[in-house]
């Protein structure tokens, strides 16, 4: 009941889609901080073919020591959340940084710190079929290019 009332009051303050995404991101972050797993419907093609638009993903909270290259993680941007594959972990000035990349993206994402990481994708549902996240690392550069070409083609075909 509390959650429903809270969402109702939040929805009254939302004027734009951007506001809605920020509120949902904040709510997801709060739930993950409390140890709750999230079931979210994916949108976009940045993780194609591992995660496709309409797939359901399960995001669970993750401890820093459990973050491994190849894992698919969710991290917080200013107004939304990004779900990409962790490709590099490095330390600078006694602080750990994590770099992700979408499976069909041309470039790496900006470095993020652990406090920006919301959780790790534990499962992907394609329809009713449960898929485990592909923890292959490193992904060859040619695979990124191939995935990008497929994504461009799918975007082009959606216009027809």
PLM regions and their residue ranges:
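Extended hydrophobic leader/signal-anchor segments used for secretion and membrane insertion
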Residues: 2-160
